[in-house]
Amino acid sequence: IFFALEAAVMAYALELALDIPPTWGYLICAIVVIPLVTHGVSAISRLQVWTQPLWLLMLVVPFVYVLVRDPGAFSGVVHYGGELARGATFQLPLFGAALTVGIALITQMGEQADYLRFMPARTATTRGRWWLGVLVGGPGWVVLGVLKMLGGALLAWLALTHMVPAERAVDPNQMYLVAYEYVFPHYGWAVAATALFVVVSQMKINVTNAYAGSLAWSNFFSRLTHSHPGRVVWVVFNTLIAFMLMEMN
């Protein structure tokens, strides 16, 4: 499911930048990860390392430009009363709805185990650093998660104020397109930057999703059938399921 969600976001980026219909975009975004994942963790690790500087730069720069060019945006999102324009007063039902989403996302911290499994063995000399790495990369990841949620709220508010319909304002492509319009005066450059950032982000996410999914399917079926046809089979199997979910909308 996570693979399908993230691949769909990347497909919408291809539609935005290259006018590729989502039906074909789903197929492209599903199969493009297969060569990387079948080469194993070493290829995935290299991809993550090589793309990290670009990803961090493209993540932060739009927020800096928004802060410089529209300082009132941060105040505006705090005082935004929602679609019903109830003002900035506390509303228990709205708080409950937001809390439900937040609590559900906390369970995704378990996905960090996919990265922590590659931690080097704990030794007497690395005990302190080992525990620090586990805490920061595991449950401590919720801190970055909160920052990302707050940043997403700001971008969604910016999208709404730029007349993006509410049902489309949840699309990261629309969020970052509005933000990158603060960076680039030319709309075409903003579209290109948005598409590049979203594609890099979703590739970084989905190589992990595909790898973790293949491990899960492999473990499940090896215990059920007592056979192991190879992890590549389960990479393709996992990808086909995600593709089917996307095509079924």
Predicted regions and their residues:
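Select transmembrane alpha-helical segments in multipass membrane proteins
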Residues: I1, R86-L99, V183-S201, F237-L240
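Hydrophobic transmembrane alpha-helices that form the core helical bundles
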Residues: I1-D19, Q202-N219
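Selective recognition of specific alpha-helical transmembrane segments in multi-pass small-molecule
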Residues: F2-E6, L54-V66, V101-Q108, W131-L160, ...
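Hydrophobic alpha-helical segments and their helix-loop junctions in multi-pass secondary transporters
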Residues: Y12, L16, I20, L56-E83, ...
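Membrane-interface loop-to-helix entry segments
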Residues: W24-C29, V33-R69
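TM-loop-TM module centered on a large, flexible mid-protein loop between adjacent transmembrane helices
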Residues: L147, G151-N206, R223, M246-E247
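Loop-to-transmembrane helix boundary motifs in multi-pass membrane proteins
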Residues: M203, N219-N249
